[in-house]
A protein has these predicted regions:
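Short helix-loop capping/hinge motifs at secondary-structure junctions, enriched
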Residues: 125-132, 151-153, 239-245
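Short helix-initiation/N-cap motifs at beta->coil->alpha
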Residues: 70-79, 172-193
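Bacterial N-terminal signal peptides
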Residues: 7-18
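A ligand-binding cleft/hinge motif common to bilobed small-molecule-binding domains
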Residues: 93-102, 193-222
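Ligand-binding cleft/hinge of the Venus flytrap
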Residues: 56-61, 134-185
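N-terminal segment of the mature folded domain
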Residues: 24-146
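Periplasmic-binding protein-like
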Residues: 116-118, 147-149, 214-248, 251-267
């Protein structure tokens, strides 16, 4: 007779490894979603939240309805979102698609792309290396940070650096760019920390990061030929508080657009 424990391990281990390598959280069957608590609750990755908070301030001033925005790495808020989220936001289409694998209350049919922004180059304050565009990043000795989910984190930055580097169909561009990468951050927050702590020369990211961290970074645009665009989107729960839809109405209004544009979000 074969030993039972090794046989069980052989059967279970591959499955367990697959779970540990997932780029999204696992649904908790014991959690029952109920968003009707009189508070508009939004959850999503860091980045858009700073602009969303400005819109929320205007909404609360006009209506008196509380809006609670929770942002950051998904593991820090997933259980609460499974319980009471009115709105999820995705920082890219692939980002929200991954979220919907966990938050089964929400439907892909209800996802609304609301704004879009371009990939840019963040450089150290004052741009000490004089970076003016993508070609400067191919120079020997450049230190570049990129954002990459690496199969274990859900982030809008996944693949962006490769899309930018390979935009013109040049394998040599990809090779030379990759040689200069000093950190792959599993999320924009992690990338920002690496950019600061390593005093990297450049970081391929989104406009909102240097805009909201002017003491640390400056923004250098990519050329039109190199620019990659990704959207921010929202999806409402079927049982969302009625005020949640009204908040989205303000978010997507002309007033909302003016606020969002202050951090690089356009449409």
């Amino acid at each position: 007779m074969k030993p039972v424990i090794p046989a069980l391990l052989a059967a279970v281990l591959p499955w367990a490894l697959c779970l540990s390598a997932t780029a999204h959280e696992i649904p908790a069957p014991a959690i029952v979603h109920n968003a009707r608590d009189g508070v508009v609750r939004l959850y999503g990755a860091g980045g858009p939240d700073t602009a969303f908070r400005k819109v929320a301030t205007a909404y609360q001033k006009n209506t008196g309805v509380q809006v609670v925005i929770t942002a950051g790495p998904e593991p820090t808020w997933t259980k609460n979102a499974q319980a009471n989220a009115d709105i999820l936001w995705g920082t890219a289409e692939q980002d929200i698609t991954a979220f919907l694998e966990t938050y089964k209350t929400f439907s892909s049919r209800d996802v609304m792309p609301i704004y879009i922004r371009p990939a840019i180059i963040a450089v150290q304050k004052g741009n000490p290396k004089g970076i003016r565009g993508f070609d400067d990043l191919l120079k020997n000795g450049m230190k570049i940070v990129v954002t990459e989910g690496s199969g274990v984190a859900n982030t809008s930055g996944t693949g962006v650096w490769e899309d930018v580097a390979g935009r013109l169909g040049s394998l040599d561009d990809v090779k030379r760019f990759r040689t200069n990468i000093v950190a792959f951050g599993k999320g924009s927050g992690a990338s920002y920390k690496a950019f600061v702590s390593m005093h990297a020369d450049a970081w391929i990211t989104w406009p909102d990061w240097p805009i909201t961290h002017p003491e640390q970074a400056d923004l250098v645009p990519l050329s039109k030929a190199r620019t990659i665009w990704r959207d921010v989107n929202v999806v409402l729960a079927p049982d969302a508080d009625p005020e949640a839809r009204k908040f989205v109405g303000l978010l997507t209004s002309e007033e909302g657009a003016r606020i969002m544009k202050t951090e690089g979000w356009v449409r």
